[in-house]
Amino acid sequence: MQICLMDETGATDGALSVLAARWGLEHDEDNPMALVLTPQHLELRKRDEPKLGGIFVDFVGGAMAHRRKFGGGRGEAVAKAVGIKGDYLPDVVDATAGLGRDAFVLASVGCRVRMLERNPVVAALLDDGLTRGYADADIGGWLQERLQLIHASSLTALTDITPRPQVVYLDPMFPHRQKSALVKKEMRVFQSLVGPDLDADGLLEPARQLATKRVVVKRPDYAPPLADVATPNAIVTKEHRFDIYAGTPLTE
């Protein structure tokens, strides 16, 4: 994949070359999207809109730390949607990981989560965030146990994952109406990078085959159900629906 690769660390250790080789990235000086190594983290920038700033994954500080410490925890809609109850903490595959926010919330309340991300740039951002998170004295221990990244296309990987999870979580890219400034910024940068999720409808059936208990699909409240498959089971928040579908139980 072609993208502008930039190193602002001041180091001459070849980290950019290692990054490019690992994720199959090719430097393109004229690309409007840039993946930038800064002294703090790896970030994505839209060069023709510098005011948008950089997008990076941060599990340790910022909004994620606030959500972990002061958010609803088990009471969050995503936790209810995957079925967390009492001692039941399902094993989850997040097949559309994005920046890993919902996966992190589920991991923080005790679920083991495998994140799938097919875009190599987004996978590189997630990997960078995980590396920093794993090294953190406060959250590193449980984060290593509960949150992992698999770089693969969900459409193919969903048929190959073992062991099977109890829950598959899907949050496909959908054109957002007006949202908070942060989401708007991220969506603009993200959609410039990955484009619309045109094959998202194809995820529902393999997800239902893989999950032993349920599939949860996060949708904006105005969006039709994924693959136009309606379900009476949903958890509804102010702006989203978490549509719930039955999985395929394990056979003896």
Swiss-Prot record:
One of its GO terms (cellular component) is cytoplasm. The keyword Chaperone does not apply. Its main location: cytoplasm. One of its GO terms (molecular function) is rRNA (guanine-N2-)-methyltransferase activity. Its EC number is 2.1.1.242. S-adenosyl-L-methionine binds at R101, D102, E117, R118, S153, S154, D171. It comes from the Bacteria. It is found in: Cytoplasm. It catalyses: guanosine(1516) in 16S rRNA + S-adenosyl-L-methionine = N(2)-methylguanosine(1516) in 16S rRNA + S-adenosyl-L-homocysteine + H(+). Keywords: Cytoplasm, Methyltransferase, rRNA processing, S-adenosyl-L-methionine, Transferase. NCBIfam families: PRK10742.1. Specifically methylates the guanosine in position 1516 of 16S rRNA. Belongs to the methyltransferase superfamily. RsmJ family. This is Ribosomal RNA small subunit methyltransferase J. The lineage of its organism: Bacteria, Pseudomonadati, Pseudomonadota, Gammaproteobacteria, Enterobacterales.
